[in-house]
From Swiss-Prot:
This is Phosphate acyltransferase. It catalyses: a fatty acyl-[ACP] + phosphate = an acyl phosphate + holo-[ACP]. Residues 296-360 are annotated as: Disordered. HAMAP family: PlsX (MF_00019). It comes from Deinococcus radiodurans (strain ATCC 13939 / DSM 20539 / JCM 16871 / CCUG 27074 / LMG 4051 / NBRC 15346 / NCIMB 9279 / VKM B-1422 / R1). Its EC number is 2.3.1.274. InterPro entries: FA_synthesis, Phospholipid_synth_PlsX-like. SUPFAM superfamilies: Isocitrate/Isopropylmalate dehydrogenase-like (SSF53659).
Length: 360
């Protein structure tokens, strides 16, 4: 039942899975889409701790018929770190909604924390509250980019502009575990982003990382070798590792190109009467294509901090769209049981969780 609660008196569920803590105040578009998502999740059987301003959340929940009977609890946290504020504010603003979310995970009252808000603040809160997994020196942002047959997992997508070769090897192991556990990939392959497929191509950092990854091949990861930018979208490997500067450029480039291509398609279909008539015939198919290519649906962020995979930051849509059933993607030849959850996703792995990832 929808109810009011506070971090001090919340308790773990006596039976079943722990709830998911949702930072209802974070994001570019306010609490409305967050509450909408929480209600949809609750109706599908997921228990939710809705963290944010109690008065505003109850008012928003009241717009949803039957919300009082859903497994949603409101956790009061009126403070929110805005998108324009500094990530370091999490240190002093302990009552901020993202800090409350990560504390709920640490205290074992939530299985995971979800936020649409400030990426830096989310990362900082996770690091300060949950800590790192042993053996992981730096967090990374993980992104799923649309590719042939499904998606390619890219990291780092922006957390670390300057990295050491050892970080790339650590992220390869994190991403491998992530895909095995959460995406049912039996044997995900890892590629190292470079300017050529040859082992000696790339910067000194890339060459050294290649040596480390090659040594790890067969010991927790399956290393394919160097890959180029085009391979990300060809599904040459399941995972591509790179530094955060390059990864973020790749991510933003893909988003920009997707918008350009969609714009070209729209222009072509509106160029003359025949094109408009043809567009009517393929309208539904084109909507599905636009859904797959829409940059606002491509990003899901897991903060790979090295502490446990406890934070998930989906990207909010810029505008509402009708839900469309996704067509099943062709299985990859390397992955016997790969799921293809639509388009890209950005996220982070390595945060501690109250329950094993597979229990979510």
């Amino acid at each position: 039942m929808s109810a009011e609660a506070s971090p001090a008196n919340l308790s773990a569920k006596a039976a079943g899975r722990l709830p998911v803590a949702l930072d209802a105040m974070g994001g570019d578009h306010g609490l409305t889409p967050n509450v909408d998502g929480a209600v949809q999740a609750a109706r599908s059987g997921v228990s939710v701790l809705l963290v944010g301003d109690r008065v505003k959340l109850h008012a928003e929940l009241g717009k949803h018929e039957g919300s009082s009977r859903l497994p949603i609890e409101v956790v009061d946290a009126p403070d929110v770190i805005g998108m324009e504020e500094h990530a370091s504010d999490v240190r002093s603003r302990t009552g901020a909604s993202i800090n409350v979310c990560t504390r709920l995970v640490k205290e074992g009252r939530a299985a995971a924390a979800v936020s649409m808000g400030h990426s830096g603040a989310t990362m900082a809160s996770a690091l300060l509250t949950l800590g790192r997994i042993k053996g992981v020196d730096r967090p990374a942002i993980l992104a799923h980019l649309p590719a042939q047959g499904g998606f390619t997992t890219l990291l780092d997508a922006g957390a670390n502009a300057d990295v050491k070769p050892a970080y790339l090897a650590q992220w390869a192991r994190l991403a491998t575990v992530y895909l095995k556990v959460l995406e049912d990939r039996d044997n995900p392959t890892v590629g190292l982003l470079s300017i050529g497929e040859e082992d000696h191509k790339g910067s000194q950092q890339v060459v050294e990382a290649h040596t480390l990854l090659r040594a790890l091949d067969g010991q927790g990861i399956t290393f394919y070798g160097n890959v180029e930018g085009r391979d990300i979208f060809r599904s040459t490997t399941d995972i591509v590792v790179t530094d955060g500067f390059t990864g973020n450029v790749v991510l933003k480039l893909a988003e920009g190109e997707a918008r350009v291509l969609l714009g070209w398609v729209k222009e072509a279909l509106n160029s003359n009467v025949k094109s408009k008539l043809g567009g009517l015939l393929v309208r539904d198919s084109l909507r599905g294509l636009a859904e797959r290519m829409d940059p606002s649906t491509l990003r899901r962020e897991h903060l790979d901090r090295g502490a446990g995979a406890g934070l998930y930051r989906p990207r909010q849509r810029r505008r509402p769209r009708r839900q469309k059933r996704r067509a099943a993607c062709r299985p990859r030849p390397r992955s016997a049981a790969g799921r293809a959850p639509g388009s890209g996703v950005r996220g982070a792995a390595g945060l501690r969780t109250a329950e094993p990832p597979g229990s979510l």
